Swiss-Prot record:
Segments forming domain ATP-cone: 49-139
Requisite cofactors: Zn(2+)
UniProt cross-references to InterPro entries, sorted A to Z: ATP-cone_dom, NrdR-like_N, RNR_NrdR-like
Native source organism of the sequence: Thermoanaerobacter sp. (strain X514)
A GO MF term: DNA binding
Protein name per its UniProtKB record: Transcriptional repressor NrdR
Family, per entry: Belongs to the NrdR family.
Transmembrane segments: none
Residue intervals of every unnamed zinc finger in the record: 3-34
PANTHER family documented for this protein: TRANSCRIPTIONAL REPRESSOR NRDR
Length: 158
């Protein structure tokens, strides 16, 4: 492994261990020339997952799009970025663990809305308004009424 400090092409492995989630191997290495230490990760190469868009185009799955969409929906809301990163991790694991090579953007959007609804209702409505592309104010109001009804039911059951 090439040293990131001096560029020497050889190093020795000092320590190897699995990461906490057991999806990769963390290796501590030492450069044979300059002696500096660095860390590398070894991971199984995954086949790309394709997202089937609403117009039937296909594009490579990008977990960052999920995070960016939620960040946009949560602008000026009291939702910590850490929460959004955790949601992104959960959705990402769910998609990867499904072992499917294709997933629809609709399925991903529904997963995001399911999570956002429990975190911040305003962010949920913002995300839903873009994702569901409401045709008019009435369909938007129907979604709000449904959300209010669910919210009231939760309060009654609490």
């Amino acid at each position: 492994m090439k040293c990131p400090y001096c560029g020497y092409p050889d190093s020795k492995v000092i320590d190897s261990r699995p990461t906490d989630d057991n999806t990769s191997i963390r290796r501590r290495r030492e450069c044979l020339k300059c002696g500096k230490r660095f860390t590398t990760y070894e991971k199984v190469e995954q086949l790309p997952i394709l997202v089937i868009k609403k117009d039937n185009r296909r594009e490579v799955y990008d977990r960052d799009k999920i995070l960016k969409g939620m960040i946009k929906a949560c602008e000026k809301r009291p939702v910590p970025i850490k929460v959004l990163e955790e949601i992104t991790d959960e959705i990402d694991k769910r998609i990867i663990n499904s072992m499917e090579r294709e997933i629809t953007s609709t399925e991903i959007g529904e997963m995001v809305m399911e999570k956002l609804k429990n975190v911040d209702e305003v962010a949920y409505v913002r995300f839903a308004s873009v994702y569901r592309q409401f045709k008019d104010i009435n369909t938007f109001m129907d979604e709000l009424k449904k959300l209010l009804k669910e919210s009231e039911t939760k309060k009654e059951n609490a």
